[in-house]
């Protein structure tokens, strides 16, 4: 992260104020203040992660994935032979915290802050699928988008989507 000396001074002062306002996280803010004041390049890269960016297209794709899982679950609930498909297969798992943290953070934001998809079960790991899911979800979306009635899926269509 490139910053001018003036920007570093402003951010350093912000961390100093946060130390006073939030004593429970004071040590963390003091550490960040030191990194900013001294310009430690390697550690300043941590700020890049904190101030990351998720493009609009990516956000829309994540919402589309969540909407697909909503449609899968609604369709599964309406099936007469729902027992043939395990409910866990139509339950949104989330994203891998280790490799897809930005996506996971957006899912948590959508559910916990925006109040969308609150009916999704976060499980004990808070939507951490613990395995990379992005590519799997992309394949599933391709199949889902090709279905003529995306919210009234047949058993066969549900199986095609979850097995993509």
Curated annotation (Swiss-Prot):
Pfam families for this protein: YfbU
InterPro entries the UniProt entry points to: UPF0304_YfbU (IPR005587), YfbU_alpha-helical_sf (IPR023146), YfbU_helix-hairpin_sf (IPR023145)
Signal peptide location: none
Domain of life: Bacteria
SUPFAM superfamilies in the record: YfbU-like (SSF116960)
Alphabetized HAMAP family for the sequence: UPF0304
Stored NCBIfam families: PRK05445.1
Family named by the database record: Belongs to the UPF0304 family.
Protein's UniProt name: UPF0304 protein CKO_00501
Organism this protein belongs to: Citrobacter koseri (strain ATCC BAA-895 / CDC 4225-83 / SGSC4696)
């Amino acid at each position: 992260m490139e910053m001018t000396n003036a920007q570093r001074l402003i951010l350093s002062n912000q961390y100093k104020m946060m130390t006073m306002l939030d004593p429970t996280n004071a040590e963390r803010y003091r550490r960040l203040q030191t990194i900013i004041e001294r310009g430690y390049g390697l550690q300043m890269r941590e700020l890049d992660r904190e101030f990351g960016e998720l493009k609009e297209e990516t956000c829309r794709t994540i919402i589309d994935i969540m909407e697909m899982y909503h449609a899968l679950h609604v369709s599964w609930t309406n099936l007469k032979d729902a027992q043939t498909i395990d409910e866990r297969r139509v339950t949104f798992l989330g994203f891998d915290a280790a490799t897809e943290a930005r996506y996971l953070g957006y899912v948590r934001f959508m559910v916990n802050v925006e109040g969308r998809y609150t009916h999704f079960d976060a499980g004990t790991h808070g939507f951490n699928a613990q395995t990379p899911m992005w590519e799997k979800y992309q394949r599933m979306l391709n199949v889902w988008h090709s279905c003529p009635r995306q919210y009234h899926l047949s058993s066969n269509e549900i199986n095609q989507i979850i097995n993509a």
